[in-house]
C-alpha cells in the first residue's frame, strides 16, 4: 500500500525585536553576527563571503558590505534594535557600525569587548618589509 505523503509544514521564523550585533574585526577579515539576547545566531556575514578576496577583504568597504548583508537577513526576523559588541583592532570596526545604522537599525549601545591579555601569549614578531 502506498504511503501517504507527509506534509512538511513551513518553518515559522521567530520574531525578535532586540538583537546583539557581534563584530569581529581582525586585520585580515571582518565577521558580523547578529544574535538574539540569548546568543542564538539569527544571521551572519563575512567580508570574504561577500565576494572580497585577498587584501580587499581587510578594507572598511568590505566590512560595510558584510554588515549590510547581515542586516538584511536579520530584518527577516523583525530585528529593530541592536546592541553592538566590537572585538578586534581591524579596519572594519567603525564602518560596520555605520552600515548597521544606515540599514535602519536603532543602535542602543556600543561595547568594545576586545580581549586584552594580562601578559599572556607572546605576540608575533615585528614585520620587516
UniProtKB/Swiss-Prot annotation:
SUPFAM superfamilies tied to this protein: Translational machinery components
A cellular component term, taken from the record's GO annotations: ribosome
GO MF entries: rRNA binding; structural constituent of ribosome
Domain of life: Bacteria
Record carries keyword RNA-binding: yes
InterPro entries with a match to the protein in the record: Ribosomal_uS11, Ribosomal_uS11_bac-type, Ribosomal_uS11_CS, Ribosomal_uS11_sf
Pfam family membership, one: Ribosomal_S11
Function: Located on the platform of the 30S subunit, it bridges several disparate RNA helices of the 16S rRNA. Forms part of the Shine-Dalgarno cleft in the 70S ribosome.
PANTHER family the record matches: 40S RIBOSOMAL PROTEIN S14/30S RIBOSOMAL PROTEIN S11
Subunit structure: Part of the 30S ribosomal subunit. Interacts with proteins S7 and S18. Binds to IF-3.
Family: Belongs to the universal ribosomal protein uS11 family.
Protein name, per record: Small ribosomal subunit protein uS11
Organism: Photobacterium profundum (strain SS9)
Phylogenetic placement of the source organism: Bacteria, Pseudomonadati, Pseudomonadota, Gammaproteobacteria, Vibrionales
Amino acid at each position: 500500500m502506498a504511503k501517504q505523503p507527509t506534509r512538511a509544514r513551513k518553518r515559522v521564523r521567530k520574531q525578535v525585536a532586540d538583537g546583539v550585533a557581534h563584530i569581529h574585526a581582525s586585520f585580515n577579515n571582518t565577521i558580523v553576527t547578529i544574535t538574539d539576547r540569548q546568543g542564538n545566531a539569527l544571521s551572519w556575514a563575512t567580508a570574504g563571503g561577500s565576494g572580497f578576496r585577498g587584501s580587499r577583504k581587510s578594507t572598511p568597504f568590505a566590512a560595510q558590505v558584510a554588515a549590510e548583508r547581515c542586516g538584511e537577513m536579520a530584518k527577516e526576523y523583525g530585528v529593530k534594535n541592536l546592541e553592538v559588541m566590537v572585538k578586534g583592532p581591524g579596519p572594519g570596526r567603525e564602518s560596520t557600525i555605520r552600515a548597521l545604522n544606515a540599514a535602519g537599525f536603532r543602535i542602543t549601545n556600543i561595547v568594545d569587548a576586545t580581549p586584552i591579555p594580562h601578559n599572556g601569549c607572546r605576540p608575533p614578531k615585528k614585520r620587516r618589509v
